[in-house]
Amino acid sequence: MNDTILINRLPTRTWNRLGVNETAIAWGQADDLGEEKITAAGQTERLEITGSGERGEKMVDIHAPAGQTVTVFETLRAEKGLLVRTALHVEKDAKVRLVQIQNAAQDSLLRLETSGECAENGQVELIQVLLGRGDVYSDGQFELNGNGAGFTAGIGYLGQKQQTVDMNLVVNHWGQKTTSEINAAGALKDDAQKIFRGTIDFKKGSAGSVGSEQETVLMLGDGVVNKTVPLILCAEENVVGNHGATIGELDEDTLFYFESRGISAAEAENIMARAAIEQLARTIEDEAAQAAILSELEEVL
């Protein structure tokens, strides 16, 4: 039996008519897929997380000891419903690099709940690659508790057909001189719909902190729906927060350029739709992950 649950809540509500305060989905009892605990400092861990039943739930706990770096790749293979909860614990002067790659079935529903806590000078680098199959709901909550803690996120997505891509990312600055940088980029085709909520919250006591967020969206169809919600909250005076969004279409000059080289409009759209994910893949600096991403792109486009 399914219940209706509310996920991806904005920390501060806005007008209900905008439809971005939270998202309601149908979800029920899920099979327990167990828990992974990772503390392998200085190494790269690779997890293949597969949900083959009606619904499955997986827990991943990542701990970076003081002064150490932990790198984890999660490949997420949802057949129907899959919830992956990943918790990051970053001690002083440590770093976690988490790369999440969606490789799901067409009619699947993938939920990502990713959270993190950073001590003094602790760092989190989050990379999410959402490859255009199935519905995706991603919720990230990160706490920069220690002075000098930092968070960066690179998110690349493709939405097509009747797909839903629904994202919520919240970074809370508690410590002094903390930093955050959020970059999201993607393309929407056919009748896809997407929400991106990005919140940077400067708490009282976070003096000297800096945060920025930027999203770039390419809209490739009259039926697509895009909602971009950048939000900066501030309870501290001596901080710097920036946000921006670039939303555009494939213009006639660009189409003419492609067509003059024998590339059809449909092929040109696919090339441009791939661009954000290909660019993000190059930053991963891991040949196996890059090859998997590019191979999946070839299948979906």
Region roles according to the model:
Residues 30-256, 260-263, 284, 290-301:
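Conserved beta-strand/loop scaffold segments within soluble protein domains that form the structured core
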Residues 18, 23, 28, 206-207, ...:
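Short cationic/low-complexity microdomains
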Residues 255-279:
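Extended amphipathic alpha-helical segments enriched in small hydrophobics
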